[in-house]
């Protein structure tokens, strides 16, 4: 069976003399593994479209265990990401995160669109990286089915509290009367709650110029990291740490 779909290259590994094994996040088939035969021959017409991050149009043959790339045409190679180590590292973080949280063969159109928009944003020079990355993380959780409850207490629905905490296991805010519902809940400031709501509601292209303090970014980053870890249990955040040191 042949399918035609757009997709992003998440991973590209050498295989044998001239082949490549690809992990592709496709629009129509979700995350898939595909072999690109002869792709590493200098004159291969697959070569351009299968580099990491590449957004390409693929014609894929679905075999028993794996797809085979029969044609591919690069639509966007994200060149600016490749020449700037900082952007490259953040893009690698997003790629790893998507790879870790998606299931082979399961489509997720909202995540696919978000991933594409975010890579296109990271290509631009006049952007604020931190709000973009935080927005990506919180939207990713939403699209995986873990939309955090940020308007009221997740335990008693109260909108009033002396101070909020965020419970990763309960998936939202806890008011001061409900702290005992999760002993590992983390303090969260009112400003961070407002920022999280903003990032969740707005399209990611609308947060590209948003200025947030390092302090606020750190606060939300810690909470989202805990939230992602609790529900995906697969990701170690090493590439994010590398990106932040640059
Ligand atoms: Zn409560």
Curated annotation (Swiss-Prot):
InterPro entries: ARFGAP/RecO, DNA_rep/recomb_RecO_N, NA-bd_OB-fold, RecO, RecO_C. GO terms for cellular component: bacterial nucleoid. Keywords: DNA damage, DNA recombination, DNA repair. One of its GO terms (biological process) is DNA recombination. The keyword DNA damage applies. Involved in DNA repair and RecF pathway recombination. NCBIfam families: reco (TIGR00613). Belongs to the RecO family. This is DNA repair protein RecO. It comes from Alkaliphilus oremlandii (strain OhILAs) (Clostridium oremlandii (strain OhILAs)).
């Amino acid at each position: 069976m042949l399918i035609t779909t757009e997709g992003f290259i998440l991973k590209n590994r050498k295989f044998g003399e001239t082949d490549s094994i690809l992990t592709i996040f496709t629009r129509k088939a979700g995350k898939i593994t595909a072999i690109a035969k002869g792709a590493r021959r200098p004159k291969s017409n697959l070569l351009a479209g299968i580099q990491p991050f590449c957004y390409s149009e693929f014609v894929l043959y679905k075999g028993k265990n794996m797809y085979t790339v029969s044609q591919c045409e690069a639509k966007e190679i994200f060149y600016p990401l490749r020449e700037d180590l900082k952007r490259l590292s953040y893009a690698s973080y997003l790629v790893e995160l998507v790879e870790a949280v998606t299931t082979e063969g399961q489509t997720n159109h909202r995540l696919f669109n978000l991933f594409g928009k975010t890579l296109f944003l990271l290509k631009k020079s006049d952007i604020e990286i931190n709000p973009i990355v935080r927005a990506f993380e919180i939207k990713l959780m939403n699209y995986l089915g873990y939309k955090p409850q940020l308007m009221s207490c997740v335990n008693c629905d109260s909108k009033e509290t002396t101070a909020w905490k965020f419970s990763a296991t309960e998936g939202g805010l806890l008011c001061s009367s409900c702290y005992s519902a999760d002993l590992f809940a983390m303090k969260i400031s009112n400003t961070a709650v407002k920022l999280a709501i903003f990032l969740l509601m707005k399209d990611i292209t609308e947060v590209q110029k948003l200025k947030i303090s390092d302090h606020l970014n750190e606060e939300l980053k810690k909470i989202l990291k805990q939230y992602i870890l609790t529900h995906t249990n697969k990701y170690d955040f090493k590439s994010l740490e590398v990106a932040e040191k640059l």
